[in-house]
Amino acid sequence: MSRRRAHDTEDEGYDHRRNKRRRVSENQEIEDRLESLILRVGERSTSSVESNLEGLVSVLEADLGTFRLKILRILSDCAVRMPEKCTVYTTLVGLLNAKNYKFGGEFVDHMVKTFKESLKMCRWDAARYSLRFLADLVNCHVISATSLLQLLDTMIDVSNEDTVPQVRRDWFVFAVLSTLPWVGRDLYEKKESALESLLLRIEVYLNKRSKKHHNALRVWSSDAPHPQEEYLDCLWAQIRKLRQDNWAEKHIPRPYLVFDSILCEALQHNLPTIVPPPHHDNFEYPMPWVVYRMFDYTDCPDGPNLPGAHSIERFLIEEHLHHIIETYHHERKDCAAQLLSFPYKHKIPLEYCIVEVVFAELFHMPTPRYLDICYGSILIELCKLQPATLPQVLAQATEILFMRIDSMNTSCFDRFVNWFSYHLSNFKFTWSWDEWDSWLLLDGEHPRPKFIQEVLQKCLRLSYHQRITEMMPTTYAKLIPLTPVPNYKYANEEAASLPGTTVAHQLVVAIRQKCTPEEVVNILKDIPNSGYSGEEMSDGSFNALKIDVFVQTLLNLGSKSFSHSFAAISKFHSVFRALAETEEAQICILHNIFELWSSHQQMMVVLIDKLLKLQIVDCSAVATWIFSKEMTGEFTKLYLWEILHLTIKKMNKHVIKLNSELSEAKDKLAKADSSSSDSEDDSSHKRKKPITHADKPSEEVVERMEEKLEAANVNQKRLFLIVFQRFIMILSEHLLRSDTDGRDPDTDWYRWTIGRLQQVFLMHHEQVQKYSSTLETLLFTSDLDTHILEVFQQFVALRA
């Protein structure tokens, strides 16, 4: 072969590769353009939704031959990820089906596959949106009404399953009910008797289901002025109202009505038989909730009316607003802008709807979806974007919450405190405090003065003491926090009579001269174990006076800031560990922190958090200290429960971390063994990558990890047993004493305490659930007072 010929061949090869790359690039550009067109269809533009759809159908129809799979994937993704545009995309699919029946069938198959996969993978929202999309395709003459009703009936069959959690049955009923607003009218016109039969089956189920969980999830214990309805009961009432109105709703846009003459000529597809996957123990279903209500039409000024609590429009509006928050919560400015750009804002009092939905998220039980500060920051952005109206609505909401606070759930009380203090800090702490003057005459444990006091404590964390003092009217003097300074007893006037004063002064000099931990130990060694303690807690197993002198002196020297305190603790970590060998000694350390910093709640919180991180004190010691007699006067203060919850969370995170590490190690071991076995069987022509020793944990390592996890589980169980046992003891004692004295046990103290018990159950429900049978056997037995036992039974019912 000549050189010339070889050269030509090389050029041809190069041109071929270049043309192939160009085709790939061009295809990618077309795919990107198609995706952009599909994603943006129906959004604000100079032309109507209908003309947008017509233009897009023409484009997609031309590209179906080449980009069929891509178009199928994009449309099915939009159905799940953009439920607010459901009817736009169903109309698009309907028009494509009218032009290309085969593509319509392929899309239905694709959506069915998405729906089944979502159910199998426990992606419950995705499954619900897929079902809604399939249902709306009935309106577009893509799917037959008969086959949809068969699917809905199959889903309602789950409500008759035995030995499965009620939350599973509830979800399938909820999924069907929440789909009916889209397709109810069409089913009513075409298959009225079948629809009525379906509704009757739902009603039978709803009438017999247990609602033991209801009270645990309420924001308020009182139903005045707005009932706190369980979510399925509320939706069922809304669906019944919709049925009374002949399934005519006024909220859902239905662009397919314009194309009815085209769509009604299209051939329909039948859904295949879809059987919901059976229940497995590892399936987690959405927990029940209570529908939050703050406003009704009387709260809103002149303008559009707020839809009634049982109108389906209220459900649809709230669901849409919740979805906006879910989509944009990572970026507060975008979230606020999207909420205020709600497409139907001229038909409703939008500011009231938004504020109600944001507080519904914040007060959601057992825990909010996102951090408290997420909702606070969104509300701030809303006030900035809509300064003429939204601050007034928010002030009105705050007043409503404050006036109803005496029946508010304890967890929601905490969140209200956190939100309001944060909000004030962003608006120069401006509030009409004079309007709340009259509530200062109430007992200090009453929720209203308690709320004001806790808000001021939180404001102190976000500002400084002098600012808080200056901003408050003089009538609030008794609620203003104490000046946050350490109370170092070895520098007080009475210090000369205290047994540890001399050593404390020596220690001050030594630490200021940058002594070593060993030198501190040397100074402390001469302190006698006299059994001295501020609470006589020493039984001789530890030297309480030595702990007293060391802890108070060191932390007083580090009192300038959190950083100074942390540095001091870290430097003398070994001394702390040596002194804190027993749980009693650890409680003594906590006692001294409280004695030194009783006027600075935040300092106590961060110091105890630091001691837990450094493993100087155990979680069980903190729990025991919180319930000790010394802390009786602090028992209803919010910071103490902040400490308990951070303690429990620390233990929970430790257990979760060990569990994750063990699972990962077991997976690696199993894969290594499997790979080794496959390599032996594999033919020599295909050599597999060898598993290195570093990749494969030994069985001994896995066994040690199992032992560590078992020990952590034991400690976690012990922590919960301590907490719940102490709650039972103090509540039982209160109830017995009230009965003996003939007094009403339902005091403010009792409501705070029973609320805190409920809070522990709900805030840590995932971890507590593991030990529910143990708790039932050892603590929450049938002979326990019904008031206490009911809290436990409500908790168990959440996932029953």
From Swiss-Prot:
Region feature Disordered, mapped onto this chain: 1-26, 669-700
InterPro entries registered for this protein in UniProt: ARM-type_fold, CBP80, MIF4G-like_typ-1, MIF4G-like_typ-2, MIF4G-like_typ-3
UniProt KW keywords: mRNA capping, mRNA processing, mRNA splicing, Nucleus, Phosphoprotein, RNA-mediated gene silencing
Residue span, MIF4G domain: 31-243
Keyword Kinase tagged: no
Superkingdom in the source lineage: Eukaryota
Main localization, broad class: nucleus
GO BP terms, alphabetized: 7-methylguanosine mRNA capping; mRNA export from nucleus; negative regulation of viral genome replication; nuclear-transcribed mRNA catabolic process, nonsense-mediated decay; primary miRNA processing; regulatory ncRNA-mediated post-transcriptional gene silencing; RNA splicing; siRNA processing
Location of the protein in the cell: Nucleus
Coiled-coil stretches noted in the UniProt entry, renumbered to this chain: none
SUPFAM superfamilies (UniProt xref): ARM repeat
GO CC field: nuclear cap binding complex; nucleus; postsynaptic cytosol; presynaptic cytosol
Function: Component of the cap-binding complex (CBC), which binds cotranscriptionally to the 5'-cap of pre-mRNAs and is involved in various processes such as pre-mRNA splicing and RNA-mediated gene silencing (RNAi). The CBC complex is involved in miRNA-mediated RNA interference via its interaction with Ars2 and is required for primary microRNAs (miRNAs) processing. Also involved in innate immunity via the short interfering RNAs (siRNAs) processing machinery by restricting the viral RNA production.
Protein family according to the UniProt entry: Belongs to the NCBP1 family.
Assembly: Component of the nuclear cap-binding complex (CBC), a heterodimer composed of Cbp80 and Cbp20 that interacts with m7GpppG-capped RNA.
Protein name: Nuclear cap-binding protein subunit 1
Name of encoding gene: Cbp80
